[in-house]
């Protein structure tokens, strides 16, 4: 209200001062103009009177008629009681006057007015005319002083020695006129004061009703807004500047209210605990997440000191006062204990709020509840321990895999050597079979020519017996070698079975490694960023396990091919051995026949045909055996090649296991 009264007083003082100043100027100018008008009238009257007087006395004076001149002055005295006329000589002595008492006296002694005397003395020296208002004996007179020059027509009386013969001084009593002038001035001043008061009153009433009262209402509404009440309304009647000001203020308040509601909505929409304080560290806003921490309704803390709010939770540090005082951002960690004993680990960040001049007028405190982070840190630590345990298990598996791979490499080396030996034996069998085939062919050729050489039957029969004995012996050797080859192939099949069991162990290890890698990847995914490095390790372990499984499958396929080839070779060798045994039996029969050739010459032809037929069958069987042995040799070489490939794959598995172990060691570090 003091501001409103001050505004009204200022407006009234301004209006009154301006009006008073204007009316004073008008009053002074009016008085001056009235005085000047009055003086102008008096001056023109005095000039006319002096000219009339001069005209009246000019004739008698020019004739030297002293009596006539005196009569003229007497007539003026009788006719114009308010006029005093004096004529002096060049010494200032009064020679003629409307008053007989002052004749022959100096004008300076009669007229007690220093200002007039100065003009009078000047008029005695030079030809001049002066008018002046003067006060003589308390009365106002308008004085007209005129020099009387020594004109030629005056020389006959006064001579030529004095240029100025004297002066005519006429004093007109203007006291009534001046009194009337003052009365008019007083009336003018009175009217001016009345008009001033009326104007000030009307302006005051108008200003109070049309301006001050509306400004006071605006100030009152502004005061409510200052107190935080933005629900007020402004008047909008009229179309003047104050109405537009009301409309602008209403629009501004609406904008501020909407902006404040928007800001409050933004603050309420923030999900982290937050508080806003003013320059005196009082809480202006606190959101629901912050109230959830203290387990109290938010409205209970509005307007309270923020430091007291924090101290009730055991926080001695005044985190906002420091920012309000220094104007710098501040952050740190605190622990807040709620009334129910729950302790919240909190991280705070406080920033100053500044006005448009850069002065700190508040602060905003953002509180981050670290409870979940602490719980996550604890879970991460547990997961880290679990991951280390899994890493130990993976290390054990890798070491086991390395040992198994080393053993498998050793076994594959032995298998490769056995396959090499089998290939060598098969080569020897093939050579023997080729020799046997040549022998059987020769037997068939000899049997064919036996019929033509019947006459040599006894000798040839003896030779045939010997050859048949050799054939039986060679056939027995072929059978023995075939049986040895079959045994070697059986041993190769058994060792292939052993390799299959080792591959199964490797498959089980690879499956277990893949499962452990999958579990480790799951645990690492649960651990989030902390387990990302181990997730990479687990992925590498899983890839190594997959490569191991692929390699073992290739080895299994190679072993299966070896086993199949070995079984086929065993079957062929069994058939070959049986055929060789049949051949050996037939060769023995042939020997018996040849033994009885001498006694049974008549049946030589038939026996020779039988021998030829048997020889042809033996040649055919020998060719089949030769082909089978060649096939066995090819299979053995294939087995040897696959064994080498399996050894390379197993060595790769061993390298992968060592790499897995190195990765796990790196993860531990």
Curated annotation (Swiss-Prot):
Its main location: membrane. It is a single-pass membrane protein. GO terms for biological process: chemotaxis; signal transduction. NCBIfam families: sensory_box. One of its GO terms (cellular component) is plasma membrane. GO terms for molecular function: transmembrane signaling receptor activity. SMART domains: HAMP, MA, PAC, PAS. It is found in: Cell membrane. The chain crosses the membrane at residues 11-31. Keywords: Cell membrane, Chemotaxis, Membrane, Methylation, Transducer, Transmembrane, Transmembrane helix. InterPro entries: Chemotax_Me-accpt_rcpt, HAMP_dom, MCPsignal_dom, PAC, PAS, PAS-assoc_C, PAS-like_dom_sf. Residues 330-382 form the PAC domain. Residues 397-633 form the Methyl-accepting transducer domain. This is Chemoreceptor protein A. Belongs to the methyl-accepting chemotaxis (MCP) protein family. Pfam families: HAMP, MCPsignal, PAS_9. Gene3D superfamilies: 3.30.450.290, 6.10.340.10, Methyl-accepting chemotaxis protein, PAS domain. Residues 209-261 form the HAMP domain.
């Amino acid at each position: 209200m003091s501001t409103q009264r001050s505004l009204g007083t200022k407006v009234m003082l301004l209006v009154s001062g301006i009006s008073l100043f204007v009316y004073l100027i008008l009053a002074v100018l009016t008085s001056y103009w009235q005085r000047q008008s009055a003086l102008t009238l008096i001056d023109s009257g005095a000039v006319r009177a002096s000219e009339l007087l001069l005209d009246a006395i000019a004739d008698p004076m020019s004739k030297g008629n002293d009596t006539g001149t005196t009569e003229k002055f007497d007539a003026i005295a009788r006719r114009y009681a308010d006029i005093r006329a004096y004529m002096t000589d060049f010494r200032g002595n009064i020679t003629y006057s409307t008053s007989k008492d002052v004749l022959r006296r100096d004008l300076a002694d009669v007229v007690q007015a220093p200002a007039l005397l100065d003009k009078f003395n000047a008029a005695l020296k030079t030809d001049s005319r002066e008018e002046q208002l003067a006060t003589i004996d308390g009365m106002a007179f308008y004085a007209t002083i005129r020099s009387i020059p020594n004109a030629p027509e005056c020389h006959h009386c006064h001579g030529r020695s004095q240029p100025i013969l004297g002066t005519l001084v006429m004093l007109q009593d203007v006291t009534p006129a001046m009194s009337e002038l003052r009365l008019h001035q007083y009336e003018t001043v009175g009217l001016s004061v009345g008009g001033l008061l009326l104007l000030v009153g009307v302006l005051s009433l108008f200003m109070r009703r049309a301006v001050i009262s509306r400004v006071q209402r605006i100030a009152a509404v502004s005061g409510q807004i200052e107190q935080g009440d933005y629900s007020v309304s402004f008047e909008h009647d009229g179309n003047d500047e104050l109405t537009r000001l009301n409309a602008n203020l209403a629009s501004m308040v609406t904008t501020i209210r909407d902006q404040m509601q928007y800001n409050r909505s933004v603050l309420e929409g923030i999900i982290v605990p937050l508080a806003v304080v003013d320059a005196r560290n009082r809480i202006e806003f606190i959101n629901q997440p912050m109230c959830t921490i203290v387990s109290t309704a938010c409205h209970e803390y509005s307007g309270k000191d923020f430091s007291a709010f924090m101290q009730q939770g055991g926080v001695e540090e005044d985190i906002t006062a420091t920012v309000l005082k220094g104007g710098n951002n501040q952050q740190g960690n605190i622990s807040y204990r709620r009334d129910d004993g729950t302790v919240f680990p909190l991280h705070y960040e406080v920033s100053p709020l500044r006005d448009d001049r850069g002065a700190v007028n508040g602060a905003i405190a953002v509180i981050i509840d670290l409870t979940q982070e602490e719980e996550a840190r604890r879970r991460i630590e547990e997961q880290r321990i679990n991951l280390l345990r899994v890493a130990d298990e993976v290390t054990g598996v890798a070491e086991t895999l390395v040992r198994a791979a080393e053993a498998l490499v050793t076994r594959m080396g032995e298998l490769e050597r056995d396959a090499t030996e089998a290939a060598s034996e098969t080569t020897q069998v093939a050579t023997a079979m080729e020799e046997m085939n040549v022998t059987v062919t020769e037997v068939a050729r000899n049997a064919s020519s036996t019929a033509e050489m019947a006459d040599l039957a006894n000798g040839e029969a003896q030779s045939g017996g010997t050859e048949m004995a050799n054939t039986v012996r060679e056939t027995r050797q072929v059978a023995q070698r075939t049986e040895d080859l079959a045994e070697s192939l059986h041993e190769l099949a058994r060792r292939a079975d052993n390799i299959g069991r080792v591959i199964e162990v490797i498959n089980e290890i690879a499956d277990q490694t893949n499962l452990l890698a999958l579990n480790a990847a799951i645990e690492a995914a649960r651990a989030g960023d902390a387990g990302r490095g181990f997730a990479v390790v687990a992925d590498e372990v899983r890839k190594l396990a997959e490569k191991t499984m692929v390699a073992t499958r290739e080895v299994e396929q190679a072993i299966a091919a070896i086993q199949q080839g070995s079984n086929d070779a065993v079957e062929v060798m069994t058939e070959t051995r049986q055929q060789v045994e049949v051949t050996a039996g037939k060769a023995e029969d042939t020997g018996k026949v040849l033994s009885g050739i001498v006694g049974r010459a008549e049946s030589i032809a038939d026996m020779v045909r039988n021998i030829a037929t048997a020889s042809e069958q033996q040649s055919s069987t020998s060719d089949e055996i030769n082909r089978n042995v060649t096939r066995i040799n090819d299979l053995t070489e294939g087995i040897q090649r696959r064994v080498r490939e399996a050894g390379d794959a197993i060595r790769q598995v061993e390298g992968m296991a060592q790499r897995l172990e190195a990765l796990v060691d790196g993860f531990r570090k």
